[in-house]
């Protein structure tokens, strides 16, 4: 079973091949969730935000 993601919406997760995998959510949103510790601008669209936190 997949691990629970720390955010309500994370449709575009990118994970490393390490064991355990380290993942980041690449969803572009207008506002990061309150559980996000490091919210930054999207590279593709600076008006949107991407949570840069990683999770296992």
Curated annotation (Swiss-Prot):
Alphabetized PROSITE patterns for the sequence: BOWMAN_BIRK (PS00281)
Gene3D superfamilies to which the protein is assigned, alphabetical: Cysteine Protease (Bromelain) Inhibitor, subunit H
UniProt xrefs under PANTHER family: BOWMAN-BIRK SERINE PROTEASE INHIBITORS FAMILY DOMAIN-CONTAINING PROTEIN, BOWMAN-BIRK TYPE BRAN TRYPSIN INHIBITOR
Annotated source species: Triticum aestivum (Wheat)
Coiled coil feature spans: none
Transmembrane segments annotated in the record for this chain: none
Keywords: Disulfide bond, Protease inhibitor, Serine protease inhibitor
Disulfide cysteine pairs (residue numbers): 10-25, 15-23, 32-39, 36-51
UniProt similarity note: Belongs to the Bowman-Birk serine protease inhibitor family.
Protein name: Bowman-Birk type proteinase inhibitor I-2B
Gene Ontology MF terms in the entry: serine-type endopeptidase inhibitor activity
């Amino acid at each position: 079973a997949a691990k629970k993601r720390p955010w309500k919406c994370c449709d575009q997760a990118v994970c490393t091949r390490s064991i355990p995998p380290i993942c980041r959510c690449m969803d572009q949103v207008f506002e990061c969730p309150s559980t996000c510790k490091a919210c930054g601008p999207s590279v593709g669209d600076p008006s949107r935000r991407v949570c840069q936190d990683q999770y296992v």
